Amino acid sequence: MDSLDHMLTDPLELGPCGDGHSTGIMEDCLLGGTRVSLPEDLLEDPEIFFDVVSLSTWQEVLSDSQREHLQQFLPRFPADSVEQQRELILALFSGENFRFGNPLHIAQKLFRDGHFNPEVVKYRQLCFKSQYKRYLNSQQQYFHRLLKQILASRSDLLEMARRSGPALPFPHKHHSPSRSPEEREWRTQQRYLKVLREVKEECGDTALSSDEEDLSSWLPSSPARSPSPAVPLRVVPTLSTTDMKTADKIELGDSDLKLMLKKHHEKRKHQPDHPDLLTGDLTLSDIMTRVNAGRKGSLAALYDLAVLKKKVKEKEEKKKKKIKLIKSEAEDLAEPLSSTEGVPTLSQAPSPLAISSIKEEPLEDIKPCLGINEISSSFFSLLLEILLLESQASLPMLEDRVLDWQSSPASSLNSWFSAAPNWAELVLPALQYLAGESRAVPSSFSPFVEFKEKTQQWKLLGQSQDNEKELAALFHLWLETKDQAFCKENEDSSDAMTPVPRVRTDYVVRPSTGEEKRVFQEQERYRYSQPHKAFTFRMHGFESVVGPVKGVFDKETSLNKAREHSLLRSDRPAYVTILSLVRDAAARLPNGEGTRAEICELLKDSQFLAPDVTSTQVNTVVSGALDRLHYEKDPCVKYDIGRKLWIYLHRDRSEEEFERIHQAQAAAAKARKALQQKPKPPSKVKSSNKEGSTKGLSGPSEQSQMSLSDSSMPPTPVTPVTPTTPALPTPISPPPVSAVNRSGSSTVSEPAQSSSGVLLVSSPTMPQLGTMLSPASIQTPPSSQATARVVSHSSSAGLPQVRVVAQPSLPAVSQQSVGPAQPLPQMPAGPQIRVPVTATQTKVVPQAVMATVPVKGQTAAASVQRPGPGQTGLTVTNLPAAVSPVSKTAMSSPGNSAPSASTTAVIQNVTGQNIIKQVSITGQLGVKPQTGSSIPLTATNFRIQGKDVLRLPPSSITTDAKGQTVLRITPDMMATLAKSQVTTVKLTQDLFGAGSGTAGKGISATLHVTSNPVHAADSPAKAPSASVPSSAPAGTTVVKVTPDLKPTETANSAFRLMPALGVSVADQKGKNTVASSEAKPAATIRIVQGLGVMPPKAGQTITVAAHAKQGASVAGGSGTVHSSTVSLPSINAAVSKTVAVASGATSTPISIGTGAPTVRQVPVNTTVVSTSQSGKLPTRITVPLSVISQPMKGKSVVTAPIIKGNLGANLSGLGRNIILTTMPAGTKLIAGNKPVSFLTAQQLQQLQQQGQATQVRIQTVPASHLQQGTASGSSKAVSTVVVTTAPSPKQAPEQQ
C-alpha cells in the first residue's frame, strides 16, 4: 500500500465539482502527430466545447506569448496584417462562414465523430496507403497497355505513310469483332426466334407452342455481355434541354421484363376480371398519347390545327429544298470552273429555284415510300435499319435516305427528333461512332458497322434488332459527346497543336458601329476582289489572316450567277458562299477563340448578307457551317468541349503559307482532273465552243506550269496593300488569250508529272504521335471515409435493469435509540456519482454479495480537534431482513505493532437480511494483496468491462479458457484509476458468527476506532503509517441501529448515488457457521469520492451515527471518537434513503439520496466507504445491501464512473456470469459462459425461453417470516431479492 500512497492521496483532477457538470473520462486525440488527452464531454457536447474554445478564453485565459504563438498559424496579409488577423479571430469565434463553413464548427464535428482518435487516424492512414498502392498498380497497368497500343499504332501509321502519298487520307483497319462460341450460339438462337416470330406473324398464328411457354426460351439473357451494364446511361443534368432528356430515364432489363410478365400471367390466372386487365376500351392511339405526353412532336400536339398547319408548311419547304439541292448538284457537274473538287458540293448551301425548274424535276428522284420504319428507338437504329435493307451503302446514299426520312411527316413522332436540327449532317459521325472510331465509345464497345476501303461503302455487322436497348443507351451517350466524336485522323490533326494566336488582343466581340462596319466592308470588298490570294483583315487593333477562297485558283472569275441562298444577296460573286463568310468570321475572332454567338455577330457585318436576315436564321446556318468546316480534311476550326469555344486552327499561318498551300491544292486538283479525263486526238475544228474550252484549259495550265516553276524558287514575301478608299470593282472578266495551244495533251501532262514535286513542297506535316493519343482521364479512387465511433448513451430513461423498490416507510423499531439524530449543518456542495446495480447469480452455493457505495471522506486540509468523548447514535432503517447477533472481541490491525487503547462499539438491532457468511470482494487493483487484509483474486473471476471506463489497448482485454472476459491492469492504468482520495474499510468475519441462539436480541460487534484526532498533514490513506500521539484515552463505543424516518433538509448538499446490486438468498434455516478471522481474512475495498453533486430532495433518510460511550468491556481510556456514516439509497418515486455522515463536533454531513439518470450510465463495482483515521486501528464495519434501485429521470447529473473491481470473486459453481457491460438493452443473450448486457425484463424472458438460465424474481416476504432480529411489532411486508437456480416459467418477473 505504501507504493500507492501518492495515488491515493492526490486529489482527483476532474475539474470543478460544485456545478454538477464535472468531466470524467479522458479521451486520447492525435492532433498533427501530438497525442493529447481531452475530456470526453468536451469533445461530445458542443456547448461545453464552445464555452471553452471561445473569444473570452482567447482574451482572458491565454497569455500574450500563447496568443503570439497561435497567431503564427493564421494567414499572413500583405498590408495591416495585425488588424486583419484580429478581424479574422473575431470572425472565427463568432461562428461566421468561411465559404465552406466555420473551422471551429468543423473541428467540433470531427472531435465528436472520433476522427482524431489514434486508432481511427492510424487506420485512415493505412487505408490511404492501400488506396494509393492500388492507384499506382492501376496506373502501371494502364500505361503498360497504352505503350503497347502506341507502338502498334505507330508501326501501322508509318507503314501506311510509306505506302500512300501525303495528301491521301490514311486508311484505317476496321477489325471485325471476334465472337466467342457462346455469343455466336446466343445470336443464332436470337435469329432463330426472330425468324420464328416473323413466320408466326405472317401466318397469323398467335398460340404458343410448348417450347415457347417457358419465358426463358424466348427471352434469353446474353451470356457474353449484358446490354444494360455494358453501356451505363450517364445522367448529366445541365442547363441544356437536350441533356435533361436523359435525367430520369428508367431502364428495364430482361429480368424486369420477365418478372413483369410473370406477374401479369399470375394476375390473369387468379383475377381474370381485374380492372387492370380490361383492355377492351383501349386503343393504340390512346397509349401513344399517354406515352408521348409532354414530348416535343407528340400526338397531342399534332391534333392542334395551328401546329399541324405549321408543320405541314415546314415539311413542304424542306422537301422543296432537298429537291433543289439534288437539282443544283447536277448543274454544278457541267461547270467545273464554278465549283471545283476542292470545295465539297454539300458545303454550298441550297438556293431556291424557280417553279419552272421544279416542274422539270424527273419523277424518279421523288421517292414516295421509304421502305423503313420511320419511328425508331434511336437514330442509330434508323441507320442500321437502312443498312440492313441496302446490305451495303455509301455515305451519300445514306445521307439521301436520312434526308428523305427527315422530310417525312412521321419523323417528328420520334422522341429524339428534336435533338438535332439536321440529322443528315450527323450521318458520318454516327457511323464512325458505331464503327468504334470515336474516342467516346465505352471500353466494352463492339462495332456494329464497318467501312469497306475498296468499295468505299458501309456494311452492317450482326443484327440491330438484337441490341435495341444497347443502341438506345449508346445513342444517348453519343448525343452528349457528339461534339468530340470526330474522325480519328481529324482529331489527331486538329489536336496535334492548338496554334498560338499571332496577335494577342483584349478585344471582346460586340455589335459593330456604323464606322466599324463600313471599314470592314471595304476590306471585305477588296478581299473578294482577289479571291485567289490570302488577305489580312485589320480591325479593332489586331490583324486576322484569312486564306484564299477554296476552289478559286486564279484571278479569272466565272461569269456564272451565284447560287440563290436565303441568307445571302443574289448579286454577290459566285465564289462568295456561306462557308467562306463563316470561315472569315472565325478567323476574325479575338485571339482565334470564341463562341458561336460571337461568330454570328462578326458575320452580321458582312455586306453579302441579305438585309432582312434574322438572328435566328444566322445562328442556324452558322451552326451547320461550323460543323462542315471542322469535318474537312484540313479543318480550320475545332470545338473545345471543356470551355465550349470554337478555336480557329489557322491563326498562326501567314499569307505566304496560305498561298503556298493553296497552290499545292490547285496543282493536285488539276492533276486529278487530268487523270480522270481521257486523252482525245487533236481536232482541227475551230468552233467557238472548242476554242472557249481550250482557252479554259490552256489558261489555267499555263499558270499552273508557271507556279510549278516558281515553286522551286524561294518564296518572295508579298506585302498586302491596304486600300485607302478604293473604288467599287468593275466586273472581272478573263483576260483575252492571244494564242491557242492546240497540243492539249502535252500541256496537261506536265502538271501531272511535276505535281508530285509541288505536293512535296507544300504537303502538311506528319501528325506527331502524341497528338493521336487522348489524354487519360485519371480518376483517383475516393478515399473511404472513416467510420464514426459509436458511443453508447442512455436517454432520459434509466438503465434497463430489474427494479426493486423497498417499502417507502417502516414502523419505528421499539429498540431504544441512544440519541436522537442531530440536525446536520449545511456543507459545501460536494461531488457525487450515480452507480448502477450489478448482479451476480449463483447456482451451487447460495451466497450474498456485498455492494458498496462511495462516500466522501475527510478533506486533508481540515484538522478537526475533538475535545472529548462524545456520544452519538448509529441509526439504520429499512433493511428488510434480520441478522443474528454476534459479539466479538477487539482485534489489532496486522499492520500496527504498537498496542493501542481502543473502545468497543456494539452494533445493535440491525434490521435487514442475513449477514453474509462469506465476503468475496476484490482488493486493491494492481496491488499485491497483503495477508490478512485482502482476498487473493484469480484471473477467471476478475471481470471488468473497461471499455467505457478507461481507454485500454486491445492487448489488455483477453478471454480465458472458460470464455470469460479478463482485463489486465497495468500500473499506468492503476494510477489513472486510483487518482483520488480514498478511504479503506476492513471487512472481517469476526463481526458475524453463530450466536443464533440469542434470538430477540440485537447483534453486537466490536467497532475498533482510534482515539486520536486527524492532523492536517496526514491524509486518510497514510493513516496506518502515520505517527500520531495517543494522549487521549480510548473508550467503548456502542453502535445501535434503529429504524428512523427523517426527511433530508433541502439546504444540505448531498451525494446522490445509486447503489450496486446486493443479492442474497433466504436464510439457510439456521445453518449459520462461525467464521473466524484466521480462516476468512478481511477484504480491503476502495471508494472514490468527489464525482458530482446535486442538491438534496426530501425523502426517507437513513442516519448512521456513531455514539462513543463507556461500556463494560473497556480496553483502555476513552478518547475522541470519529464517526463516519454510510448512506444506502433505496430510491422510490418520491422518497429517498439518505445516510448522513456526521463528523464529530463539526457534524459535517454527507447525504446520499435520489438522483437523476445521467447522460452516460456506466456500471461501477466494489465501492465502499469509510475513513481510516490516524491511529492504531482502522475502522471496521460491514453493511450488507439488498436493494435494487431504478434511477429517477433527470438531466442534471453528469457521471464519470471509475470501476474498481468486481463482486463475486470467490463464488463457486458460477455457471452463467451476468456482468455489467454497455451493450444496449434488448441484446440477444447467447447460451454459455459469456458476458451479457444488463439484465432487463425482456432479456430475462429470453433466458427463460432458452431453458438454461436462472431466474431473478421479486418476492414479497412478510416481516414475520424473517428472523427474530427484526423489530417487534413490524407486520408489514418488505421486498426481498431472491435468486433461484431453477427456471420458473409460471412466475413472470414483477417490476415495482
UniProtKB/Swiss-Prot annotation:
**GO molecular function terms listed in the Swiss-Prot or TrEMBL record:** DNA binding; protease binding
Q: What is the lineage of its organism?
A: Eukaryota, Metazoa, Chordata, Craniata, Vertebrata
Domain spans labelled DEUBAD: 39-156
What does this chain do? Binds to the DNA consensus sequence 5'-GGGGAATCTCC-3'. Putative regulatory component of the chromatin remodeling INO80 complex which is involved in transcriptional regulation, DNA replication and probably DNA repair. Modulates the deubiquitinase activity of UCHL5 in the INO80 complex.
Q: What is its main location?
A: nucleus
- Does the keyword field hold Ligase? no
**Residue(s) carrying Phosphoserine:** S228, S298, S351, S1019, S1288
Q: Where is the composition biased (Polar residues)?
A: 741-758
Q: What is this protein called?
A: Nuclear factor related to kappa-B-binding protein
Where is region (Disordered) located? 165-186, 204-232, 663-758, 1015-1036
Question: At which residues is the cross-link Glycyl lysine isopeptide (Lys-Gly) (interchain with G-Cter in SUMO1) found?
Answer: K488
* Bias type Low complexity, positions: 216-232, 700-713, 1016-1034
* This protein's UniProt keywords: Acetylation, DNA damage, DNA recombination, DNA repair, DNA-binding, Isopeptide bond, Nucleus, Phosphoprotein, Transcription, Transcription regulation, Ubl conjugation
Record-stated family? Belongs to the NFRKB family.
Q: Which organism is it from?
A: Mus musculus (Mouse)
* Xref: InterPro entries: DEUBAD_dom, NFRKB, NFRKB_winged_dom, NFRKB_winged_sf
Biased composition range(s): Pro residues: 726-737
For this record, an example GO cellular component is:
Ino80 complex
Localisation: Nucleus
